[in-house]
Amino acid sequence: MRHHRYNPDFNFVVEPEDFNKYSDKELLQYCLGATMYMPGIKDFTMKILNKEMLGLTSMVFCFEDACSEELVQAAEQNVLHVLDALSTALDTGVVTYDYLPLIFCRVRNQQQFEHFAEQLTPHHVKVLTGFNFPKFNAHNAEVYLYYLQKLNDKFGEIIYGMPIIEDPEVAYRESRISELVGIKKILDKYKEIILQVRVGATDFSSCFGVRRGVDYSIYDIMTVREILADIVNLFGRNNDYVISGPVWEYFRVSKQMMFETLPTHNIDDCLMKRIPIVNNEIDGLLREVILDKANGFVGRTVIHPSHIKYVNALQAVTKEEYNDAVSILGSEKGGVFKGECGNKMNEVKPHTTWAQKIYMRSRGYGVIENENDFINLFSEK
C-alpha cells in the first residue's frame, strides 16, 4: 500500500513509501493512518479488489460492537471467506501486496478470539495483519497476548496485536494508574508483536454520561482528556508505543464534497478561526486530528469512508518539520542550533524523540511544502 494514491498528481517534496504487512515494524506501526472499522458480517471482497474505498490502507473486521451476538458465527465464516478470496487473488496475480490493505479482526472476547483463530489456515494468515483486542485490561492482557504469540509460532508468520484501552478501570481516577502500569508491564513482555496501542474514547465518555458534539473535540471533554493524557504519559514515553487517536462519530453523506474555492489561509488557521473548509462534520474531524498530532497520537480509528483521506492527509509532514527533524537526527555534536526557517530553536537532546516521530511519519505519509498543501492534498483538484 501507499498513502494518498487517490491524488496521483500531487507534488510531494518527499514521496511516501510503500508498505505491507511484512514491512519492518518500526515503519509499519506509523503507517496505519485512518483505520476503518467494518462489520464482520459484510463481504467486502470486491470493494477491496476493485479499490472502491478511496484511500483505504488499513481496515478492521469487527466481531464486537458492529456485530450482534447471534451473528458472530456467520461473521466468522464471512471473514474467513474474505481472507480466503483475497489470498487466492494474491496467488493468482489479481492483486499484489502493494494494493492490499492491512487487515485486522476486532474480536469479541478471549473465547471468540480463540474460536476464530482455530479456524485460520496459512492461506488466511498471509493476508491477515493482526487482531484488535477490545476492553483490554491487566486481567485479560496475558490471555490475549499469550495466545497471539502461540499463533505467531504456529504459522511462522507475523500476526500483530493492537490492544484497545477503553476499560472503566482506566476511566476511573482511583484505579487508572495502577491499571495502566499493569497493562504496560504485560505489553512490554510481548512488545515485538504489538503494532499500536489504541484508545476507546466513546467507551470512556459513556462512563461519565457525556458525548462530544460536532463543534467540540474529545479534548474538550475534561474527564476523557485526563484519561488520554495518562495513556500517552505511560505508553508514549520515548516513542515506546505508537498510540492512535479515537474515533470521530460525525459524518455527512454527500454526493459531492469538492472544493470550488480553496481557502487561502493555512489549515490550522482556518480551523481554529472556524473558517469553513468542507462541512461541520469534516471540519470537526480535522480540528481533532490537529490536536491528536499536537498530543502525540498517530492516525486514528474511522467509521466512515469519507474520513479516510482527511485523516491520512494530515499525517503528512511539512518540509520545515522534516528538515528540522533530519537536522536534529543527523547532528553529531548535539547542542542547540537555529531551525530550518530561522524561526525556532532546535535542541538536539530534548527534541530527538520528536524528530524520530516526524521522520517516521514522513516515510509513511510523505513530505509536503507547507501547511497550505494539506488542503491541496485532500482536495483532489
Please state what every model-predicted region is.
Residues 1-381:
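Expand to "…catalyze enediolate/carbanion chemistry for C-C bond making/breaking, isomerization
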